[in-house]
Design a protein with these regions (language model features):
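Active-site-adjacent loop/helix segments that line or gate small-molecule/cofactor pockets in enzymes
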Residues: 1-30
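Hydrophobic side chains within well-formed alpha-helices
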Residues: 4-7, 61, 87, 154
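Generic secondary-structure signature for well-ordered alpha-helical cores
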Residues: 12-20, 59, 66-74, 93, ...
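Active-site and channel-lining beta-strand-loop segments
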Residues: 23-44
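Short secondary-structure boundary/capping elements
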Residues: 26, 57, 83, 168-171
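Short beta-strand-to-turn element immediately C-terminal to the catalytic PLP-Schiff-base lysine
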Residues: 35-36, 54-56, 147-148
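Glycine-rich loop-to-alpha-helix module at the N-terminal edge of alpha/beta enzyme cores
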Residues: 41-126, 130
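PLP-dependent aspartate aminotransferase-fold enzymes
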Residues: 89-184
Length: 184
């Protein structure tokens, strides 16, 4: 058994298989390319599944991360930091002086959007709590974002799911319009 197979077998012993994985063990990257433990080179066209598209081993990014890690790696939002104040100021200006909340994942961002929509509805339009999402979408692994995900295979085993979600096919404006009501 080769090194790649050994690593995969070891991983399968302890990692919860909540999604399918490619049978390759990545070792390092440079720019848009990654190499597996066997030295095979691949074009990284996945971009961290929309988490980042920064490439690998960029000297400026590596330097900035190392500089920040030498100061603070992570602190709670219970504290102020200059970096957060500057980042939120820049983002706020780009969004016409809106407010910014930093989260850790897409699921957290989507969960926050669902909560913001529900809070707005609760405050200003109590009957408008229904949310429409697309079939074959994926919004995350929290219970609400899992429910918002328009794929029944992800719902199985997690019932009862939160209520208030409808689903429509992508690019079907008529179906979307038919789902819109006094509750959306």
């Amino acid at each position: 058994m080769g090194r790649q197979e050994e690593i995969i077998q070891k991983d399968m012993q302890s990692y919860l298989p909540v999604f399918s994985r490619y049978p390759m063990v990545l070792d390092h990257g440079n720019g848009a390319y990654v190499w597996d433990v066997n030295g095979r080179k691949y074009l990284d066209a996945l971009g961290g599944i929309a988490v980042n598209v920064l490439g690998h081993n960029n000297p400026d990014l590596v330097s900035a991360v190392a500089e920040q890690a030498a100061r603070l790696i992570h602190v709670s939002n219970l504290y102020y930091t200059e970096a957060q104040a500057e980042a939120s100021d820049k983002l706020s200006r780009l969004t016409r002086d809106g407010k910014v909340f930093f989260g850790n994942s897409g699921a957290e961002a989507n969960e926050g959007a669902i909560k913001a929509a529900r809070k707005y509805a609760h405050t200003f339009a109590p009957n408008k709590s229904q949310i429409i999402t697309a079939r074959n979408s994926f919004h995350g692994r929290t219970l609400a974002t899992l429910t918002a995900t328009g794929q029944k295979k992800f719902h199985k085993g997690f019932e009862p799911l939160p209520t208030g979600f409808d689903y429509v096919d992508f690019n079907d404006a008529a179906a979307l319009e038919s789902l819109m009501s006094d509750e959306t």
